[in-house]
């Protein structure tokens, strides 16, 4: 009996230790294999504009581990972390070591895979006496991201290293404040795409600090809510900065998002307006994290978005996006860039685990009258863990047709020999 008691105590201690060291485990992945009718691997083509189904050539994954490390008298501290990786899936072993080969007469080296630290932060709740319901945070994190899943298009996302307070109860809604760093680490000249190193005094990049304030959860009518936010991009150049960096202007971005809950889904309508460098976000499907500091003084832009998912009877669901964005005076006076996109994804559910998915996308980039047009048609058979539009994991067998009509009559596919192409493959996607 004594031996049994010792074993029981050991088992109990082991279980208790396991509970003490348990962590929250979340993640995302997509991976698969595909080929292109022109030869070679499948490609990714303007997926933010024409849709992502059957249009992703990468392997991408996120592993998120978090743990509540303190909980006492209503006060909690939580440590969160995330690692991400991406590759083209070309080999069994994909790491950071460079693979070198001949590219014509030159040796070209590329990394098989890239790894990144996407999140590492501390979140404290109940520690602010004036707002015990709010969360105080600092570190690197995904910050209240807004995206359209069917095109992988993030339209409001200032994620990065920073600090803030979120979820302060204020009237009918909740207030959040954040300060996030979004440096420009590429070269630019004012009014052009490349040139001088922006700021030698800051490691070659221009320091951009984004100040963000949001008021969310404002009830407007039955099942309808409003979120509004303001982002201020502060360009913080040093004395060693280039003239272009010193001439760069701070910018403001305003966002309003109306969410309407429906009996069988939801719909979101978004309006955004920005000045100076934020004008480029609306012309080029940006999210506010990349600030176009080289934009011409006085540039501005705006964007309208409508997207959502709705059930159509017992067997059909439909996801869609409509985007219209404008950037004005970005490079020269009276210059206008218009970006337009329409994507629909109807899903027919055969049973709880089997679907047929269609996706069609069409987009136009109008550069002062010079139009580039893009299109995509995809059909896929999918097996998923449930019948919902959002059910994952999901394995898909797909075929896609891609087309491009350029203003300069150049060809996009088959190494510049064709204006359309076809590809097929298999992809798995999961989140947990």
Curated annotation (Swiss-Prot):
Coiled coil: none
One protein family per Pfam: LamB
GO biological process: monoatomic ion transport
Protein name stated in the entry: Maltoporin
Lineage: Bacteria, Pseudomonadati, Pseudomonadota, Gammaproteobacteria, Vibrionales
Single Gene Ontology MF annotation: maltose transporting porin activity
Site (Important in sugar transport): 154
Keywords assigned: Cell outer membrane, Ion transport, Membrane, Porin, Signal, Sugar transport, Transmembrane, Transmembrane beta strand, Transport
Induction line: By maltose.
GO cellular component: cell outer membrane; pore complex
Record's function text: Involved in the transport of maltose and maltodextrins.
Species, as recorded: Vibrio parahaemolyticus serotype O3:K6 (strain RIMD 2210633)
Membrane topology designation: Multi-pass membrane protein
InterPro entries: G_neg_Bact_CarbUptk_Porin, Maltoporin, Porin_LamB, Porin_LamB_sf
